[in-house]
Amino acid sequence: MSVLFPINLEGALEALLFVSPEPLSLKKIAQTLELSVEEAKEIVLRLQEKLEQDQRGIMLHFSGEEVWLTTRPDFSVYIERLFKPPAQHLTQATLETLAIIAYKQPVTKTEIELIRGVKADSSIATLLEKGLIEEAGRKDAPGRPIIYRTTAKFLEFFGLKSLDELPPLNLENEAVNDGNNNFEE
């Protein structure tokens, strides 16, 4: 064993496996740690046993001539939490805008603003960014305004198979049209 300086070989192997984007061959491990292939295999087996005994968060896999690390399945719930995308919270204004688009599509920004009575730029930008709506072309009207429609992601987000599954609007109980395209409680 011709090591450059005294070192914890299991620790060195663990570091190599941690930074390697792919499995390492025994030969590559031996070359890197300046060991024989047989010595490298001993270090691999010792580290594998040590990780198993200590119930660490990682496991060493040794198959044929390749060695790699994975996370221990027992801890998968924590890993999923770490990488789970944050919940997509939509403001009341954004939900109102989305409802208008869902029920009136295809619809322009101006039409949305006439119904809501306020600007819809921010809500539309949020819905586009989250992929819940998309541009559906341009309306054949002066200025050729962009028209919007919902996406497949919208259906998935709300657990719908099609727009036909949208609940019917009950304008008598929830909102009434005051004749000016403004809805009031």
From Swiss-Prot:
Any one annotated GO CC term: cytoplasm
GO biological-process terms attached to the record: cell division; chromosome separation; DNA replication
Subcellular location as annotated: Cytoplasm
InterPro entries the record matches: ScpB_csome_segregation (IPR005234), WH-like_DNA-bd_sf (IPR036388), WH_DNA-bd_sf (IPR036390)
Complexes and interactors: Homodimer. Homodimerization may be required to stabilize the binding of ScpA to the Smc head domains. Component of a cohesin-like complex composed of ScpA, ScpB and the Smc homodimer, in which ScpA and ScpB bind to the head domain of Smc. The presence of the three proteins is required for the association of the complex with DNA.
Role description: Participates in chromosomal partition during cell division. May act via the formation of a condensin-like complex containing Smc and ScpA that pull DNA away from mid-cell into both cell halves.
Family statement drawn from the similarity comment of this UniProt entry: Belongs to the ScpB family.
Name of the protein described by the UniProt record: Segregation and condensation protein B
Organism taxonomic ancestry: Bacteria, Bacillati, Bacillota, Clostridia, Thermoanaerobacterales
